[in-house]
């Protein structure tokens, strides 16, 4: 969730924000910045380390600390220009010191920045350099694991996370490493369908973030991620509790605002959903937020405003024409979801799979293939998406629609029922479509049919039992 975009598009990101907020008239919806009254801690840190470097431009440690302040600002605001600045600061640091163990922290930070920029192989290389400089050091392991997970190398990712979790006890407390182990490992646990374990990891991470007095955004992100897990499992009240806690920790946090928009839509409170999404878009107009806002307008019977938002997503896509590394998957899914620019959707999904062989890239490819009439290939791609046993209603919905198009009604029913069993409100438009598709297959979506699908596993976090989809591969 933390991934942002490539550093080479940092200035483009600011251009998108300015053009979108100005051209589409949403800037006026943004509340006044709290920094006008209270100095922003990240800005203060940036100015402090800039001043230190002005006095001593050859002290490489100050470059590392400045990079950390820039990266934190990027996470807080969604403005990836700060990741570009962080990368530049780290490059200066490594020019001064790159071969001794003192350089390891810079390589660890560079791995984190490259992950945020979706440069996953470079992130893996950075982490490897850090580990080679200080064998046995734990700092690089979370990012080594993250890079492999993003590239779909799940067994290798697990090895790194296990090394982090099972580090030898040296008799000293390492609370920061414990937080990183809990929060990073939870993502892989979720992908592997271990939802109980993923939830426990994030719950522990939230407690540790509070105990460690981490920056407000770090706590807000952890609360947000826990809320995301609850939403995925259809536990709307718990999801709302965590997202509101995220907003208490960091007011105007765009991720939590968008999450609340999705929760309100699932609750049928569409006007409130629109308000939350509009606030998120005003802060940072990410395509996924704008598309979701359009979907809520469509669900509320306002096709004109929905189309306006959809055109805004296309506008963002045009501005990113030079380099679409970050938004490939989001744009591919948007085009496929709304039957727009379908050949382009397929091209974007294929391009994304070149660098990310993870389950979600396979899902995007499967959906784009279906919409382009390539049903056989879509079945192959959706099997790849389901291979880890990930509990995700949208994956199951896509699988159900693909098998319906292929004429395999038994599998279609199994996947559509599973989607609604996981979360009957998983999407403001597609959950109703899943129910209609089941009706067309002469199967009434009901509590009884969902509860009968209880073969293996658990939906976790107190959720209902789950069933492996018919014919689906859950091998790692």
Residue ranges of model-derived segments:
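TPR alpha-solenoid repeat register
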Residues: 62, 103-106, 140, 174, ...
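N-terminal leader/linker segments that initiate helical-solenoid repeat arrays
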Residues: 25-105, 424-425, 431-450, 455-461, ...
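Canonical tetratricopeptide repeat
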Residues: 65, 109, 143, 184, ...
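Structural motif corresponding to the intra-repeat A-B loop/turn of tetratricopeptide repeats
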Residues: 73, 77-80, 117, 151, ...
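Flexible helix-coil transition and linker loops at the boundaries of alpha-helical arrays
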Residues: 50-58, 92-105, 166-176, 208-219, ...
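Residue-level recognition of tetratricopeptide repeat
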Residues: 59, 68, 75, 100-103, 112, 137, 146, 171, ...
């Amino acid at each position: 969730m933390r991934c942002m975009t490539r550093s080479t598009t940092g200035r483009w990101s600011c251009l998108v924000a300015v053009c979108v907020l100005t051209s589409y008239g949403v800037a006026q919806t943004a509340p006044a910045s709290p920094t006008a009254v209270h100095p922003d801690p990240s800005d203060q840190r940036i100015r402090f380390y800039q001043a230190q470097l002005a006095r001593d431009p050859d002290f490489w440690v100050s470059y590392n600390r400045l990079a950390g302040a820039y990266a934190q600002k990027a996470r807080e605001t969604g403005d990836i220009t700060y990741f570009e600045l962080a990368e530049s600061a780290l490059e200066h640091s490594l020019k001064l010191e790159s071969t001794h163990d003192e350089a390891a922290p810079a390589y660890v930070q560079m791995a984190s920045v490259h992950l945020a920029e979706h440069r996953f192989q470079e992130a893996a290389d950075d982490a490897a350099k850090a580990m080679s400089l200080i064998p046995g050091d734990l700092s690089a392991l979370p990012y080594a694991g993250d890079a492999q997970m993003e590239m779909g190398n799940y067994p290798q990712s697990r090895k790194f996370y296990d090394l982090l979790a099972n580090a030898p006890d040296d008799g000293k407390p390492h609370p920061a490493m414990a937080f990183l182990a809990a929060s990073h490992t939870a993502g892989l646990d979720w992908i592997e369908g271990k939802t109980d374990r993923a939830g426990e990891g994030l719950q522990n991470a939230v407690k540790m973030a509070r105990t460690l007095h981490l920056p407000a955004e770090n706590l807000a992100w952890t609360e947000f991620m826990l809320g995301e897990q609850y939403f995925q499992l259809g536990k709307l009240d718990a999801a709302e509790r965590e997202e509101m806690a995220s907003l208490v920790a960091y007011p105007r946090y765009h991720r939590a605002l968008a999450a609340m928009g999705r929760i309100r839509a699932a609750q049928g409170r569409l006007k409130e959903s629109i308000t939350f999404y509009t606030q998120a878009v005003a802060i940072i107009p990410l395509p996924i937020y704008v598309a979701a806002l359009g979907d809520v307008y469509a669900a509320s019977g306002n096709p004109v405003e929905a189309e306006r938002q959809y055109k805004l997503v296309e506008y963002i896509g045009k501005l990113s024409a030079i380099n679409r590394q970050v938004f490939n998957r989001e744009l591919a899914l948007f085009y496929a979801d709304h039957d727009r620019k379908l050949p382009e959707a397929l091209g974007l999904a294929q391009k994304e799979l070149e660098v990310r062989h993870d389950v979600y890239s396979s899902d995007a490819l499967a959906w784009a293939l279906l919409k382009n009439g390539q049903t056989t290939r879509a079945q192959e791609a959706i099997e790849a998406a389901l291979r880890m046993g990930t509990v995700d209603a949208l994956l199951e919905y896509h699988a159900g629609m693909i098998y319906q198009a292929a004429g395999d009604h038994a599998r279609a029913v199994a996947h559509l029922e599973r989607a609604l069993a996981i979360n009957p409100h998983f999407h403001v438009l597609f959950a109703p479509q899943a129910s209609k598709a089941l009706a067309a297959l002469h199967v009434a979506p009901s509590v009884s049919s969902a509860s009968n699908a209880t073969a293996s596993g658990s939906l976790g976090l107190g959720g209902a039992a789950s069933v492996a989809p018919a014919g689906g591969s859950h091998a790692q």
